[in-house]
Amino acid sequence: MDLSSWFEFTMYDAVFLVVVLGFFFYWLTRSEQPLPAPPKELAPLPMSDMTVEELRKYDGVKNEHILFGLNGTIYDVTRGKGFYGPGKAYGTLAGHDATRALGTMDQNAVSSEWDDHTGISADEQETANEWETQFKFKYLTVGRLVKNSSEKADYGNRKSFVRGAESLDSIINGGDEGTKKDN
């Protein structure tokens, strides 16, 4: 084997060299594009009971926070704005009581008025309960959805939180954290 056989240049060598040089050129000239900034974290809302009218302004358009009611509890689903934000899959639920819509799996079933959920079947209520089980472990609990302002509870300076298995009633009635307003 002489030295000239080591320096033979074939078509395969040419293709390989072009590919390697192409990658090298790309690596040298690529622009360093910064990663997109993570979405800004909004401060948790203070705990507060709301009427349907008050809840409506938290639809992701009028306010950056996205809230909706489910089984009488208000959840801050802002971190799920890819699902619940304006124009998204469940965007029609934002700012409303979503119990009937999630129970019936019909997004058009949201109401702009107080809904006492009469007419929901046991199966539909069970479906709504399953949604709530997921929400209370994933999203911040803001308070309760009440029919009128006289039913609101005072939570002091408490911020909304992920409550998990903790009952909202135990928070309202427990210790000095929450007392019923006298209006």
From Swiss-Prot:
<keyword id="KW-0472">Membrane</keyword>
<dbReference type="InterPro" id="IPR050577">
    <property type="entry name" value="MAPR/NEUFC/NENF-like"/>
</dbReference>
<protein>
    <recommendedName>
        <fullName>Protein vem-1</fullName>
    </recommendedName>
</protein>
<dbReference type="InterPro" id="IPR036400">
    <property type="entry name" value="Cyt_B5-like_heme/steroid_sf"/>
</dbReference>
<dbReference type="InterPro" id="IPR001199">
    <property type="entry name" value="Cyt_B5-like_heme/steroid-bd"/>
</dbReference>
<dbReference type="GO" id="GO:0012505">
    <property type="term" value="C:endomembrane system"/>
</dbReference>
<comment type="similarity">
    <text>Belongs to the cytochrome b5 family. MAPR subfamily.</text>
</comment>
<feature type="domain" description="Cytochrome b5 heme-binding">
    <location>
        <begin position="47"/>
        <end position="146"/>
    </location>
</feature>
<comment type="subunit">
    <text>Interacts with unc-40 (via cytoplasmic domain).</text>
</comment>
<dbReference type="GO" id="GO:0007399">
    <property type="term" value="P:nervous system development"/>
</dbReference>
<keyword id="KW-0966">Cell projection</keyword>
<keyword id="KW-0812">Transmembrane</keyword>
<comment type="function">
    <text>Transmembrane protein required for the axon guidance of a subset of ventral nerve cord-associated interneurons and motor neurons. May function with the netrin receptor unc-40 in axon guidance.</text>
</comment>
<dbReference type="GO" id="GO:0016020">
    <property type="term" value="C:membrane"/>
</dbReference>
<keyword id="KW-1133">Transmembrane helix</keyword>
<dbReference type="GO" id="GO:0030424">
    <property type="term" value="C:axon"/>
</dbReference>
<keyword id="KW-0524">Neurogenesis</keyword>
<dbReference type="Pfam" id="PF00173">
    <property type="entry name" value="Cyt-b5"/>
</dbReference>
<feature type="transmembrane region" description="Helical">
    <location>
        <begin position="9"/>
        <end position="29"/>
    </location>
</feature>
<dbReference type="GO" id="GO:0045087">
    <property type="term" value="P:innate immune response"/>
</dbReference>
